[in-house]
Amino acid sequence: MNRLLQRQLFLENLLVGVNSTFHQMQKHSINTCCRSL
């Protein structure tokens, strides 16, 4: 059970990391689009 919990925490952390990275990329692409306009 402890191992399962660790795996769940790891997956949640991974998801949060991917989400934050995606948001940063989105912000960056929006900024570059605004600059090119």
UniProtKB/Swiss-Prot annotation:
Q: Among its keywords, does the record have Acyltransferase?
A: no
Q: Name one GO cellular component term.
A: host cell mitochondrion
Q: What is its main location?
A: host cell
Look up keyword Isomerase and say if it applies.
Answer: no
Instruction: List localization entries.
Output: Host cytoplasm; Host mitochondrion
Q: According to its UniProt record, which protein family does this protein belong to?
A: Belongs to the rotavirus A NSP6 family.
**Under what name is this protein listed?**
Non-structural protein 6
| Originating organism | Rotavirus A (strain RVA/Human/United States/P/1974/G3P1A[8]) (RV-A)
